[in-house]
Amino acid sequence: MGIGKTTALRSLCGSLMSSSDVRNLDLAAHSKELTTVGTEFGEIDLGGGEVVQICGCPGQERFSFVRQWVLSVSLGVFIMVDMNAPTSLGETLHILEEIRQLPTSPVTLVLSARPATTEQIETFAQGVYSAGYGVVPVLEADPRERAQLLDAMGVLVSMLSLQSENS
């Protein structure tokens, strides 16, 4: 909760986005005013009539059914984490396991949405690898910075392109 998923969608899509934010009633878990309670959709206009459709879903476990549906229809996925949170690796491994269970797994990239040291990122990536999920790229991207998010999307598109060449 509060990693910046809605902010990232707004940064990428601007007004071409539908939000599912409501007033946060779980102030004990997080002090933010609003929280996401459903899937959010947006489009990035690439020009020339081409668009990329993106969606985001709440991270809380009580919304796992929403996340599982989104994962099942996705080609590529960003898992947004705060490397400073002690639970970030475990939560990421949980989502990676959900992805592994799908009939067709989307290409996956981890976004460190809060400042992290190179050592933290390398330790995190090694933890993912050691848990048996292979090499999952880990990039830093501020959810408020459209250019950083577009760079991360470029990496995801490259991964999708490589995947289609190898299949």
Language model features: what each stretch is:
Residues M1-E33, G42-D45:
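Conserved G1/Walker A P-loop phosphate-binding module
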Residues H30-S31, Q53-P58, A85-S88:
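Short, flexible loop segments at the rims of nucleotide/cofactor-binding pockets, characterized by
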Residues T36, P58-F63, T87-E91, Q120:
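Short secondary-structure boundary/capping elements
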Residues G49-V52, L75-G76, S105-T108:
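Loop/turn-to-beta-strand initiation segments
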